[in-house]
């Protein structure tokens, strides 16, 4: 079992986290638009996407710890 993570792997995980954070920001913007438009179905969809991405981010952060 490897007790350490290579620099390349850490950078890859960091890039994945950055990508998820950007997508999460995008969904937060779409959520705000849906709330202003009163589209409850779209609001729920965006909330679900934000939550999914947050779970993925947490999993990746655990890998780095």
Describe the function of each predicted region.
Residues 18, 22-65:
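Short, charge-rich amphipathic interface segments used for partner binding and complex assembly
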Residues 2-22, 42:
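Short, charge/polar-rich alpha-helical segments
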Residues 1-5, 62-65:
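Short intrinsically disordered terminal tails
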């Amino acid at each position: 079992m490897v007790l350490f993570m290579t620099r390349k792997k850490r950078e890859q995980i960091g890039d994945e986290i950055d990508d998820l954070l950007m997508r999460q920001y995008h969904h937060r913007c779409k959520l705000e638009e849906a709330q202003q438009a009163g589209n409850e179905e779209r609001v729920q969809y965006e909330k679900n996407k934000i939550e999914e991405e947050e779970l993925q981010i947490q999993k990746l952060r655990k890998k780095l710890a």
